[in-house]
């Protein structure tokens, strides 16, 4: 009985142990390898260890394979097995597992401070998390046999990760030339600007990320409570905190002429309410400035807040499109990622386009680049009450739906044309354009040149602006891609807004939408009752017919 019990506990204990591997031989494989996975502990540069799962591909004698390094987003964890949350529901895991099944090595590791890895979370510090990527590369080159090499003699190494894991690979590539083919998903160019545009914190995201980070790191996420970052709890980010976040961003390195040294397939979402398409565009420019190739798949999904803040589209907090129609047929996103690696790491023919944009979850366009043209309209008077305009907008959904049903019984029901509405308890909407044809789209980067005035003090006059669409026959005004930008004070505001993409139909009204309160920025509004007014110009990226664009519409 004792021997049976002892054997049971030995099996249990060994089941949680990591595999100890010998140093890999540079000679060809003497025998075939079977597909399997095992757990390892990877030593870091500063004496800690990172928990990782190695996926070993099936290889015949004499075969070689590239290696993919995969890692997770903030508060996440690695895919320990194919049948797991990350392996089945996250693009990082889906693509990594698909690559493994097609003959790639995969090393999927927990970032320091998360999951089974040691250390404290340092918010992608170049001296910590970024160096950890090099430690993983060192380990892979030392322990994985039969690694494929590129024509220049380097090992064929790719990487993938979303959000926090996307930042890891871009920053690591700036410092380590051994990475060859990256797939950064929904990540940042300027972390301060993403987390706090115009200095105002996306407080909903702050709350969710703080909770996830605390839980996944065993409540060891102390950086958020340090002095520079405590300002975030007030709704604004101090200059010191902004400086620290920028030091952990590609923007600071690119500004100094330090660029990534790998090619990249950037995947970013129009509806991403944390890091919009503009971050991918800036990262793309940084890669290209350093002489590297960077392609962009502009999907719809990414960081998506739970309903009712953003419409439901899948998993809460983070989800990506299942497929993207960049050509005649729709292709699953994991397959596009593997095609990218096949081209860059195995020398396969090119299949992934330079740019593809999803107009919604059903239609996409294969273009040369995101259109840069726009049409400018005057906005003469956008007046609203702060903070009430938009505060209870989600409660009005059934009222709007019921009103649309009743309105549908009358001919000529939709004769409002360019008449503004809202501004009291509802968001202010100032339509400036009525869509004429069913083949028009809104695709590109809006711009505003406006003066914000009001009855309160300079700092207490704060609004949130975006591009609105009021569909023909409907009362409700939709914020295109749910992209709202804070205008933090009185004065002149000249800036671009996040890029948007949406199909339009005849009779739709497009214009400026202004909120006095937004649940995306729940801590930020001025809670002192006042009136605000916007006047100036709005430039909309209206495309006046799909036939005028470089390539045709592709429908999955």
Language-model-derived ranges and their functions:
Residues 124-145:
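Alpha/beta-hydrolase active-site loop
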Residues 21-24, 36-41, 348-556:
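Glycine/threonine-rich phosphate-binding loop and adjacent beta-strand/alpha-helix elements that clamp
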Residues 276-286:
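Short alpha-helix in the alpha/beta-hydrolase fold that links the catalytic acid
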Residues 61-65, 70-102, 107, 112-116, ...:
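Short substrate-entry loop that stabilizes the transition state in hydrolases
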Residues 260, 266-268:
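Short beta-strand/loop motif that positions the catalytic acidic residue
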Residues 89-95, 101, 130, 142, ...:
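Accessory cap/linker subdomain of secreted extracellular hydrolases
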Residues 25-63:
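N-terminal cap/lid segment of alpha/beta-hydrolase-fold proteins
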């Amino acid at each position: 009985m004792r021997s049976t019990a002892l054997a049971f506990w030995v099996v249990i204990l060994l089941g949680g142990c990591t595999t100890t591997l010998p140093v890999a031989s540079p000679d060809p494989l003497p025998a075939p390898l079977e597909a399997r996975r095992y757990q390892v502990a990877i030593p870091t540069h500063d004496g800690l260890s990172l928990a990782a799962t190695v996926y070993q591909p099936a290889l015949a004698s004499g075969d070689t394979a590239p290696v993919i390094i995969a890692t997770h987003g903030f508060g996440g964890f690695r895919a320990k097995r194919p049948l797991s949350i990350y392996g089945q529901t996250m693009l990082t895991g889906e693509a990594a597992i698909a690559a493994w099944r097609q003959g790639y090595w995969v090393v999927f590791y927990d970032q320091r401070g998360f999951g089974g890895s040691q250390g404290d979370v340092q918010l992608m510090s170049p001296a910590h998390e970024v160096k950890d990527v090099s430690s993983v590369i060192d380990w892979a080159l030392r322990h994985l046999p039969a690694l494929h090499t590129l024509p220049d003699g380097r090992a064929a190494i790719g990487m993938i990760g979303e959000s926090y894991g996307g930042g890891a690979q871009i920053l690591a590539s700036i410092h380590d030339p051994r990475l060859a083919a990256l797939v950064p998903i929904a990540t940042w160019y300027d972390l301060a600007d993403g987390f706090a545009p115009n200095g105002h914190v996306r407080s909903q995201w702050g709350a969710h990320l703080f909770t996830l980070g605390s839980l996944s790191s065993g409540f060891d996420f102390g950086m958020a409570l340090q002095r520079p970052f405590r300002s975030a709890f007030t709704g604004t980010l101090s200059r010191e905190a902004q400086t620290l976040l920028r030091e952990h961003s590609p923007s600071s390195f690119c500004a100094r002429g330090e660029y990534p040294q790998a090619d990249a397939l950037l995947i970013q979402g129009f509806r991403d309410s944390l890091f919009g398409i503009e971050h991918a565009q800036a990262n793309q420019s940084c890669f290209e400035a350093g002489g590297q190739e960077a392609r962009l798949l502009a999907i719809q999904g990414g960081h998506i807040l739970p309903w009712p803040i953003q419409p439901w589209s899948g998993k809460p907090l983070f989800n990506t499109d299942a497929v993207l129609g960049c050509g005649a047929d729709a292709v699953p996103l994991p397959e596009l990622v593997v095609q990218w690696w096949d081209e860059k790491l195995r020398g396969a023919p090119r299949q992934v386009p330079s740019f593809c944009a999803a107009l919604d979850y059903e239609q996409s366009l294969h273009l040369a680049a995101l259109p840069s043209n726009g049409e400018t309209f005057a906005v003469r008077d956008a007046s609203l009450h702060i903070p009430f305009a938009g505060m209870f907008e989600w409660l009005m959904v059934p009222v709007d739906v019921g009103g649309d049903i009743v309105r549908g019984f009358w001919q000529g029901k939709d004769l409002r044309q360019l008449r503004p509405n809202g501004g009291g308890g509802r968001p202010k909407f100032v339509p400036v354009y009525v869509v004429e044809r069913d083949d028009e789209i809104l695709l590109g980067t809006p711009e505003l040149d406006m003066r914000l005035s009001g009855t309160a003090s300079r700092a207490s006059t704060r609004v949130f602006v975006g591009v609105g669409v009021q569909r023909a026959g409907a009362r409700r005004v939709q914020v295109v891609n749910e992209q709202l930008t804070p205008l933090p004070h009185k004065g002149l505001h000249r800036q671009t807004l996040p890029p948007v993409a949406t199909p339009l139909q005849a009779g739709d009204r497009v214009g400026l939408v202004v909120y006095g309160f937004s649940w995306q920025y729940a801590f930020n509004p001025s809670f002192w009752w006042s009136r605000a007014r916007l006047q100036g110009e709005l430039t909309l990226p209206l495309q006046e017919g799909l036939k005028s664009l470089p390539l045709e519409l592709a429908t999955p």
